[in-house]
Regions:
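General beta-strand structural signal in soluble alpha/beta enzymes
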Residues: 1-2, 8, 25-29, 52-55, ...
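Rossmann-fold NAD(P)-binding glycine/threonine-rich loop
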Residues: 3-43
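NAD(P)-dependent dehydrogenases' Rossmann-like dinucleotide-binding region
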Residues: 50-60, 127, 199-201
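A short glycine-threonine-serine/GTX helix/turn-capping micro-motif
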Residues: 51-52, 89-97, 199-202
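Conserved phosphate/anionic-ligand binding catalytic regions in large, soluble enzymes, centered on
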Residues: 55-63, 97-101
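Gly/His-enriched, cation/cofactor- and phosphate-binding structural elements
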Residues: 178-192, 196-203
Length: 203
């Protein structure tokens, strides 16, 4: 299934139902479209220790932010163009307010860190309040603005703490995320044995 909201909110029940039916639940399309990040996290990286995930996992918001960055469009102009081209829904709130990216962050985190992560535990901030001034200020700092989903396992006072979030982020212009144009997606996975892996492509 490509229904990321369903997987993120009812995952344990769905996996148990699949187990009882002696079948498998496939959900590669639920995160980052054609990019095989779910396959990697649930397969080749399963025996590794993932330390951090960072991703641009929503094509709608990336298209809007790219239009604001490269063409100087304001938020409403960029959103309208995204809708006209079919990259945004008539009601874009799930995308532009960060709900979609939060669900994908929860799914990737659940696969990576050995614990089920509820979508409600992922703090989120969307892009609806961003202005052309914000984009210009980022450019002055040598950065572009991207909506980034992030999950990191940290040591805090001797305890392993999972830090999660989805928010607009200043990304250095020479970072691979900065080169993702239009509705493209990208995910970076940092693991102890495998090192840093990049998954880039159409979302």
């Amino acid at each position: 299934t490509g229904n990321k909201a369903l997987i993120a909110s009812r995952g344990p029940e769905l996996f148990e139902a699949a187990r009882q039916a002696n079948t498998r639940l496939y959900f590669e399309a639920a995160v980052a479209g054609a990019i095989p990040v779910i396959r990697a996290l649930s397969g080749s990286l399963r025996g590794d220790r993932v330390r951090q995930i960072a991703g641009i996992v929503n094509g709608t918001t990336n298209f809007i932010l790219d239009a604001m960055t490269t063409r100087g469009a304001d938020y409403n102009e960029a959103l309208t163009q995204a809708q006209e081209l079919g990259f945004a829904e008539a009601d874009p709130s799930a995308d532009v307010e960060g709900y979609d990216a939060s669900a994908k962050c929860a799914i990737m985190s659940s696969l990576s860190f050995g614990r089920w992560v509820s979508v409600d535990s992922v703090p989120r901030q969307g892009i609806t309040t961003l202005s052309t001034d914000d984009i210009a200020f980022a450019a002055e700092q040598g950065c572009v603005v991207k909506l980034v989903a992030r999950a990191q396992l940290r040591d805090e006072l001797g305890e392993r703490v999972l830090a999660l979030g989805v928010e607009p982020t200043f990304v250095p212009s020479d970072h691979a995320f900065a080169s993702l144009r239009g509705p493209a997606n990208g995910v970076y996975v940092d693991a102890e044995a495998a090192g840093t892996l990049a998954f880039l492509g159409l979302g």
